[in-house]
Amino acid sequence: MEQLHLLLASGGGSKASTTITPFCLARDHASTSSPSPAAVAAPAPPPEATSGSEQSIHGSGTGLQSSEAMIKAKIMSHPLYPSLLRAFVDCKKVGAPPEVVGRLSSLAVVTDVPQYSGDRCLPAQQPAADPELDQFMETYCYMLTRYGQELARPIQEAEEFFRGIEEQIDSLALDEDVSYDYEDEVAGGLPEKSAAFGENEVTTTTRRHLMNKYSGYLNSLWTEISNKKKNSTGHLPRDARHKLLQWWHLHYRWPYPSEAEKAALAESTGLDKKQVTNWFINQRKRHWKPKPAAAMDAGFLQMHPRYGASSSSSPAAALRVEDGGGRRSAYHPRGGP
């Protein structure tokens, strides 16, 4: 538009100053007559023409400014202008510092006033309906709204991710507090100085100090507990096992110790009565094979010849004699008691 005004202004000045000769007439005139320096040189424009061109340029600039002001007035007087400005401010808020967000929010509140005083566009001065302007405002409102949503989505996802990480860290910190409390209870509790503080006031440095202080005691206690577990699973000490084997070899024919014998073995070996009982049960299952009744009777008579002339030829009678007659033996050979 400005170039059009300039072209019109320059055209008017040239008509007022000189007369343009067509190219064909100028060529015929040059062939018939010799050119003169005054005719070749273009005459200087008069001062009136120069001042007229400057006035036309100034007038074109003023016209452009007035057209821009008119377009601004149309946009700001449009009903969708507050929505357009609010969408633009929302885009500016994404990722901005809190103080900047506050200023932008206050600006959006000011622009929500029906009569916006940017160029003092009153309702009486509102232009007529413009379908092209309506489409422009609707399109850019939609575009700015979508753009603000796309800008805010990564920030929202990042905030959700950080919240999840913080929750995991808090849960780990709670588990660590519980573990430290358990270890402190095993070690005998906190010292008197640290017991005065609350659980939340115990720092990580204090916990590390306590762990370093009681770590040796905890390790020795754990070793002792592990050894007791091993012993309770059947791994008896060597001396105790040796004494039990001695009794086993001496009573191999009938390796069933009585309750009194179990108590004596438990006292001599340092084991529990239950451990002694379990050891004999396992030993009989693995290493004891009872002999037939006839072989046992013959072997018994050979080992105890004084019972051979007894009035009763049954080994059961001999066993009853050996037990003192008042208590029956647990062994009953073939033939019944």
UniProtKB/Swiss-Prot annotation:
InterPro entries: ELK_dom, HD, Homeobox_CS, Homeodomain-like_sf, KN_HD, KNOX1, KNOX2, TALE_homeobox. Pfam families: ELK, Homeobox_KN, KNOX1, KNOX2. Residues 309-318 have a biased composition (Low complexity). GO terms for molecular function: DNA binding; DNA-binding transcription factor activity, RNA polymerase II-specific. Keywords: DNA-binding, Homeobox, Nucleus. It comes from the Eukaryota. The keyword Nucleus applies. Its main location: nucleus. PROSITE patterns: ELK (PS51213), HOMEOBOX_1 (PS00027), HOMEOBOX_2 (PS50071). It is found in: Nucleus. Residues 34-63, 307-337 are annotated as: Disordered. Residues 228-291 bind DNA. This is Putative homeobox protein knotted-1-like 5. It comes from Oryza sativa subsp. japonica. The lineage of its organism: Eukaryota, Viridiplantae, Streptophyta, Embryophyta, Tracheophyta.
